[in-house]
Amino acid sequence: MAQAGLGESLFALLEEQLQAKGLIVRRGSLIDATLVKAQPHPPRRGEPSPDPDADWTRRGKDGHFGYKVHLTVDQGSGLIRHLALTSARTSESNLFEGMVIGDEAAVFADGAYAKDARKKALRSRGIFCGIINRPWRYRPITENQKRRNKFYSRVRRAVERVFGTLKRLYGMDRCRYVGGVRNRCHFWLKGICFNLKKMLVLQGAT
């Protein structure tokens, strides 16, 4: 199942059903990433990695051995629209273009994704750019940009709640398997379970 990519295929089938039911709002996409611990314990210095697809990165002052889960969440419904799994060292910015669905009215993301060319590309496609503005060397952010950042941050909180739910209730704080292929399939299945439960909630509210 994992080798054949059936997890992603099943997720796509559910996405079609959610669209047919009119549950996906497309008001905006909330894009973010979170760190997930690898299944085996981290290797000691000089030891070979117990998981060849996991990697080290730093979170604040602490080291982290594992993976990074990237999500695209539908603003308004809270449904997961896309998911990706990479090593922890992979920059979330590198995956941004692949996380944009293309049919959303807006995209909201934190400052890690901020690039002028990226913002222009979104606007050229008619997509509102809600990427948080970052100060650059010799170019501090303006007061207007600070106000926008506060609004973008409020909108983005919804994706952080999704991550919190996935880690608290679906065990996404640690991988269950060794290797990216099996873990990627497992996380697609978790995304399916999350969306099925969310679907029942949304249908009950209509």
Residue ranges and their predicted role:
Residues L10-A20, T165-L166, W188-G191, N195:
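Charged alpha-helix within mobile-element recombinases
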Residues M1-I127, I132-R134, M199:
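Polybasic low-complexity intrinsically disordered regions
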Residues I101, A105-A106, G111-W188:
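Helix-centered, glycine/charged polyanion-binding patches within enzymatic domains
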Residues T72, F96, G164, G171, ...:
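Short amphipathic alpha-helical "recognition" segments used for binding
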Residues R27, R59, F65, S77, ...:
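Short glycine-rich loop/turn motifs that provide flexible caps or phosphate-binding loops at active sites
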Residues L6, L10, E92, V155-A158, ...:
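Alpha-helical structural motif
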Residues V181-K197, V201-T206:
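C-terminal domain-tail junction helix/linker
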